[in-house]
Amino acid sequence: MKRRKAREYVLQFLYACEMNENTQKICNYNFLQEEIEKFWERNYEEQNSDIKSFANQLIEGTIEHIDIIDKIIQKYADKWNIERMITIDKNILRFSIYEILYRQDIPYQVTINEAVEIAKKYSTKESAAFINGILDRIAKEEICHNKSAEK
């Protein structure tokens, strides 16, 4: 449950950045750190350092790889333009794809399940199914592709 709470904070952070049109600015490391610090000041009630640490890792990793992640979303989101996607759904996909591709310590099935549950809570049932389908395809195709490339 701690990690789900952290993922919910990541969604809030990414959503706020996009609504404030800060997505490109936060690619600057110093600006990103300032924004993360401000975010935790606004969410001062969260005292659990494990939650904050995991959330920070996901935020930093997602932002660091956001261009690659967005290209992957566009590749797998058949007939959907990423710019027209629901902001919540797009950002759930972003941090989940980061987890699937760059966090081998987290089983991709766990990541997908968490993304679906968060989508059900913050978006729609249709969004949950949409996110599940995209992440499942990405996990199977990208992970299998990477494993076969390693051989």
From Swiss-Prot:
Chain's gene name: nusB
HAMAP family membership: NusB
Pfam families in the cross-refs: NusB
Protein name: Transcription antitermination protein NusB
GO molecular function terms noted in the UniProt entry: RNA binding
UniProt KW keywords: RNA-binding, Transcription, Transcription antitermination, Transcription regulation
Domain of life: Bacteria
GO annotation, biological process: DNA-templated transcription termination; transcription antitermination
SUPFAM superfamilies referenced in this protein's UniProt entry, alphabetically: NusB-like
Family to which this protein belongs: Belongs to the NusB family.
GO cellular component: cytosol
Function description: Involved in transcription antitermination. Required for transcription of ribosomal RNA (rRNA) genes. Binds specifically to the boxA antiterminator sequence of the ribosomal RNA (rrn) operons.
